[in-house]
Every structure is written in C-alpha cells, then in structure tokens.
Swiss-Prot record:
The gene is kdpA. One of its GO terms (cellular component) is plasma membrane. The keyword Zinc-finger does not apply. GO terms for molecular function: P-type potassium transmembrane transporter activity; potassium ion binding. Signal peptide: none annotated. It comes from Escherichia coli O81 (strain ED1a). This is Potassium-transporting ATPase potassium-binding subunit. Pfam families: KdpA (PF03814). Its main location: membrane.
Amino acid sequence: MAAQGFLLIATFLLVLMVLARPLGSGLARLINDIPLPGTAGVERVLFRLPGVSDSEMNWKQYLCAILGLNMLGLAVLFFMLLGQHYLPLNPQQLPGLSWDLALNTAVSFVTNTNWQSYSGETTLSYFSQMAGLTVQNFLSAASGIAVIFALIRAFTRQSMSTLGNAWVDLLRITLWVLAPVALLIALFFIQQGALQNFLPYQAVTTIEGSQQLLPMGPVASQEAIKMLGTNGGGFFNANSSHPFENPTALTNFVQMLAIFLIPTALCFAFGEVAGDRRQGRMLLWAMSVIFVICVGVVMWAEVQGNPHLLALGADSSINMEGKESRFGVLVSSLFAVVTTAASCGAVIAMHDSFTALGGMVPMWLMQIGEVVFGGVGSGLYGMMLFVLLAVFIAGLMIGRTPEYLGKKIDVREMKLTALAILVTPTLVLMGAALAMMTDAERSAMLNPGPHGFSEVLYAVSSAANNNGSAFAGLSANSPFWNCLLALCMFVGRFGVIIPVMAIAGSLVSKKSQPASSGTLPTHGPLFVGLLIGTVLLVGALTFIPALALGPVAEYLS
C-alpha cells in the first residue's frame, strides 16, 4: 500500500510539472504585457467596440476595476437566482431561491469559494448553472490571476506607478488561458462519458424494477472550469463523486491535474518574469514539501481504518466510509489534499467520514491560508505574503533591512502583510465562536462532541479561506449560517486582495537594489526551510487551540 501511494504521488507531480512548464511560459508573456501570437488584432477589436481604454493603471485604479467587476457580478447573480423561475432553460420548473440562500450562493461563486448550501440538481435550473455559476467560475478565477499579475509586476518593475491594465489582463486571462484549456478538458470529459445536454430529467426503471429520476444538464462544460479555476462547486450534490460529473479514473486524474495546473504554472511564470527561475522553483519546492507530507499523513490515517469500528468488532482494516469504491482510499486521500491545498473544494469522498487525523489535515491546509499551491492567483499571492514575512524574520535575525528581489521591505509593506495574513484567522476563530454561542446555531451540528465542533470549524475555515468543501454533517442552509458564511467568504476574499494590491502599489515605486554579500539568498534550500517554518509557525500558533477542541480531542477520545 505504501509503494502504491508513493507511485501515485510521484506520477501526479511528474505529469503536473510537465504540463505546467509550457503554460507558465505563456503566462509570463502575458505578465510582461506581450500578446500571445495571433491575438493582438482580436484584442484591439474587443477594446475598440465598447470604447475601453487599455492604458496602464495605478494600484487603486486596478483594484477598483477588479472590485467593480466582482460587485456587478454579485448583484447580477443574486437577482438571477431570486428570479430563476422567470428565466429560460428550467425544464423541472424549479422555483427561485430564498434571499439568504441566493445571497450565500452569489457571494460564494463571485469569491471563487463555491460553498454550496443547496443540492444542485434539485435547486438550480440549467440557466442558473450556465449563465450564473459558470460565468462566475471564469470571472472569479480571472480576477485572482489578475491580482497576482499585478503583484509580480510590482516586484519586477522599478520606479513606476502603474501595474498594468486590469481589463486587458482579465480579457487575456479569460480568452487565451481559461477558455481554451477549459474547452479541451470539457471535450475530454464528454468523450469519457460526462453529461452535456439540455434534456429534462429522465425517468428510468432500475434493475430492481423501481422508478428513478436521473438528472441531466450541461455538466461537462461547468465541470472543466470548476476544476481549472479552482472553483469546486458541483453541478450535482455529490460533486465529483457523481459518475455524471466524474465518470472514470482517467477523468478523476485529469481533474486533480486541472486543479493544480495554473497555480503551478504561475510559479514557473514568476521565476521567468523575475529573471531568476530559481525563485519560482523555490516556491514550488516549499509548496511540494508541505503537500507531499500532508498526502502521506492522510493516506496513513485512512489506511489504518476507523478505530471506533474496530472496537466494535467490525472489519475496518481501511477506512472506506464515505468513499467511492471505484476510486479507493489512496486516490480519495490524494484528492482530498489536492482540493484543500488548492482553494478548490471539489470532493470525491465525504471529508466528514474521514478519520480524525485524516480530516484534520485538509482542515489545516485551509486554515494556513490556502498557500500550498492554492487557488488560481490567490494561492501564489498568499504564499508571497509568507515570503515577505519570512524575509522580515530573517532580516531581524541578521540585523539588516529585509529585501526581496532587490526591493526593500519597509514598515508599510510589513503592516499590510500582517493585516492580510490575519484576515482569515480572525474570521475563522470569531465565526466559530459566534456559531457555538447559542443553541439555535449549535443545533445545525448533526454530530455531538468534538466531531460536531470540527464540523463548525471546518465550515468557517472553508468559507473564510474561499475553499468551499464541507464536513457535510452540518446543516448550513439557514439564515444564520448562510449570512455568516457569506460574510466570511466576502471578507476572506476581498479583505486579502485589498492589502495585496496596496503592497503592489508600494513596491512598484521602489528601485531594485543590487545584491550584496549581506543579502539573504531567497532561492536555496535554507530559504525554503525558513519559508516552510514560517507557514507552519503561523498555522500552529493560530489554530492549535481550536484544533485541540475538535479533531485532536476526537482522535484522543
């Protein structure tokens, strides 16, 4: 079993790196404001028609463009879900959503979280899925990538005030990166058996002779961008464990690759744009080390079986509860770590049914800020915050002003870095405390004791860090939970983007200083270890008390 797990991890990472390297070169061209071959003419026409200026923006203008697009998308999606029953492509005549569920869902998809307090096949029409959710899957992913584009330019430009043009970046990312790759993935899914139709739900007779209603819909097109954009919201309630979304072992492998593809490519692109590919490899090494250790822990925990079942005399040599037998325990463990290391949230197994340690690792990966590969764009700019913090700590130890890529890191940057890093832990801990204060909110827990608290802690961790997966034992479709989680998702997304853009605006105006004998190398194994230690230290100091009340207490009981 250990050899199989090692081979699975190694194969996954090898194929991932092979695919991400050329994509990273293409992204580097876009960051350097070089159109991809054959696209410049199309871009000129698309900007000329609405009269949009393609001149460069400062950080405030860039930020306002990103926020404006997302706020407009939030309003459109909210009213679309409320009035779903008036819109076309609703063969099941599904009603509009309640205001709190519509708000939660709109915020969820605009923030790239895709938390779902509903069952897709019984709640949303084809129009809502396509024109509402799928569109936001593209736009939220493009927004995250645009922010990291701006931050990378801030490190590589000198004595400037502009970071590029948000509309140019969003257009290029959507048209030349997300759309073509998602199309290829969708066609592959269709070839493998994923649904893509507009038929009404089909009544069929099962082999036992009973009647069953099979849901239909344009699944493959949404599934592709759901994975590629690290969105994660399933067309069906069972998400990627549903055979209509994820029909074969091959589609499952491609889904895992799609989740990590752009975050990995962005690391390669960062090194190329910075003029030192070792910088990108340093980030990949740090992410990969944490990732491999986490996968190993989850695989080990799930292979050990459920000790509570063993105590009752049941055969539980491995923990298969809540897992698809066609994927097995090792693949389910790998997928769980992939989807929570990235801010995806898609699942092929029920994380609520994992062992105490097996469920704690995905929760902890979210709590440290989704920086182990992370979401498209958001993962890398989240890790860059820890890079700045690690550089600052190293500067304190050697008595020098911290610098990164030749840029001095001053008090302003460190204050903004601390603010951005503290946003999500504050939301998680305060949200969990608020949810545990009254009987009404605690009644949403379907399990007592430490595991019930773990369900609450997982939910707010998932929402605040824009992941979207859940311990499904929590009944979250209530006004309190919909509003609380919507607030966590909104602040967790934009409360980090705003200081990140402010950091970019500060750095882009600085000159790059040449390296000296006292400059800390940020591309070697020493800095990789320092960066990993910084991530672990912040995660440990912040969440160990809360984890001790949940999964740790459950493991020890």
